[in-house]
């Protein structure tokens, strides 16, 4: 009997080991997909003149075309969240990567309408990367590691964002044509899709539902998440902390540094890429700190304060006082706090709504980028009178509202309910009340 028990325990341990290994591989591959998605998201910033010439559009019109990414990304966040809860990652994440690959190939055609729809598809397919990685992290790993793993996921994403500027910039400058780059990225996307299909584990079997019942269940789950005020707060805080990167740095950063600060192209690309590089450090670091102290709100608030100071310095401070690249790097590190609402919304909603919760916060987050991107561009054109080259004052006037947005995020954090492990652990006395 003892021998049988020992064998059974060994088999259970071996099974758990295999399951853990499968989960790690699945999360890692989905994080690589997120790296790829962010590379494609940020790459247009370093080739705006080439895109403007190729499409025969003004820089502002190209910025609007590039912004179509968020018009696909934001609404499909809800689709991705529901699909993840319903079907599991293996059935939907590879499809998202394939959609991104096709979108890149369409963008490479150089036809305005085809490229615009291709950019939209890149956003629609790209949303499955973060939602899939976060779903795997929350359902296959201990809750005490949630913020760390989601932060690590965003680390991969921002590594791609940094590569989209720091690596792609020199590639384009070396003479590689913009459409060759996009065609190559399309092929990479299709390859990632195939790997995801092979490496992601099959979904766990679920009880059969009557025809149409799953749609009602999905609707109830989404309504449950949207009705939770904490969900709305999470989306607003994340969105307000994200837009300094998604709108200012990733679309206008290089041009701002060239026109307003007088840097050459190569230096502007490197300086701009320090922000997403800072995210690489900040996302896992702040996630780890939050898990370590067992609280979310203080870390979000601290990150918002530091980001506010850095953003004010980037817009109004001199460029020759602090060491090069420091302010952008610190701004990126502080921006990592924007990922903590992704953990909070999951902790503030039922476990069975995990995927939907991620979809909702992603939808609210990037709705800010989708709606406000053209607004900031319009303000910049208005204050400059449509000038071909903008001045420092033009950029300061156009992007000063970003400071108010980060300040609002800090204020909203005060109303956020603390959901960290420290408040979810039973108090020592309460744990012994029944003794």
Located regions from the model:
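Juxtamembrane intracellular "pre-TM" segments in multi-pass secondary transporters
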Residues: 9-19, 203-235, 429-435
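Helix-loop-helix hairpin linking two adjacent transmembrane segments in secondary transporters
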Residues: 112, 153-202
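Helix-to-loop junctions at the C-terminal end of transmembrane segments
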Residues: 76-88, 282-295
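Cytoplasmic helix-loop-helix junction between adjacent transmembrane helices
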Residues: 118-157
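Conserved MFS/SLC helix-loop-helix module at the cytosolic interface between two early adjacent transmembrane helices
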Residues: 75-113
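Cytoplasmic membrane-interface "Motif A"-like loop-to-helix N-cap segments
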Residues: 86-97, 291-305
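Extracytoplasmic gate region of multi-pass secondary transporters
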Residues: 44-46, 229-286, 369-377
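Extracytoplasmic
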Residues: 25-59, 248-254, 372-376
């Amino acid at each position: 009997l003892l021998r049988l028990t020992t064998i059974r325990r060994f088999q259970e341990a071996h099974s758990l080991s295999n399951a853990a290994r499968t989960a790690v591989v699945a999360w890692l591959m989905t994080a690589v997909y997120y790296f790829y998605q962010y590379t494609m998201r940020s790459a247009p910033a370093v080739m705006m003149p080439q895109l403007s010439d190729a499409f025969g559009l003004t820089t502002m019109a190209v910025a609007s075309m590039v912004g179509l990414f968020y018009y696909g990304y934001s609404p499909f966040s809800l689709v991705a969240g529901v699909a993840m809860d319903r079907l599991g990652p293996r059935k939907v994440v590879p499809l998202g990567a394939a959609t991104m690959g096709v979108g890149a190939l369409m963008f490479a055609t150089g036809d305005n309408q085809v490229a615009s729809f291709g950019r939209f598809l890149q956003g629609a397919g790209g949303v499955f990367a973060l939602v899939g990685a976060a779903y795997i992290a929350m359902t296959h790993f201990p809750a005490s590691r949630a913020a760390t793993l989601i932060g690590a996921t965003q680390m991969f994403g921002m590594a791609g964002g940094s590569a989209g500027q720091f690596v792609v910039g020199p590639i384009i400058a070396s003479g590689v044509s913009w459409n060759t780059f996009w065609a190559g990225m399309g092929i990479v996307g299709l390859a990632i899709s195939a790997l995801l299909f092979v490496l992601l584990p099959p979904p766990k079997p679920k009880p059969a539902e009557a025809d149409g019942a799953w749609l009602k269940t999905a609707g109830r789950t989404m309504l449950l998440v949207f009705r939770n005020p904490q969900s709305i707060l999470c989306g607003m805080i994340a969105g307000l902390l994200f837009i300094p990167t998604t709108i200012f740095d990733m679309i206008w950063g290089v041009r701002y540094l060239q026109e307003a600060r007088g840097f050459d192209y190569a230096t502007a690309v490197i300086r701009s890429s320090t922000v997403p590089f800072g995210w690489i450090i900040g996302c896992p670091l702040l996630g780890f700190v939050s898990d370590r102290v067992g609280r979310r709100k203080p870390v979000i608030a601290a990150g918002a304060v530091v980001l506010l100071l850095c953003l004010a310095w980037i817009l109004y401070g001199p460029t020759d006082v602090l060491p090069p690249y420091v302010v952008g790097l610190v701004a990126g590190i502080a921006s990592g706090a924007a990922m903590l609402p992704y953990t909070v919304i999951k902790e503030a909603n039922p476990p069975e709504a995990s995927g939907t919760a991620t979809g909702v916060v992603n939808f609210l987050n990037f709705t800010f980028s989708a709606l406000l991107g053209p607004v900031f561009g319009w303000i910049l054109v208005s204050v400059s009178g449509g000038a071909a080259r903008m001045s420092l004052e033009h950029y300061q006037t156009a992007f000063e509202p970003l400071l108010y947005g980060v300040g609002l995020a800090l204020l909203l954090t005060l109303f956020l309910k603390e959901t960290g492990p420290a408040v979810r652990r039973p108090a020592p006395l309460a744990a012994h009340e029944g003794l």
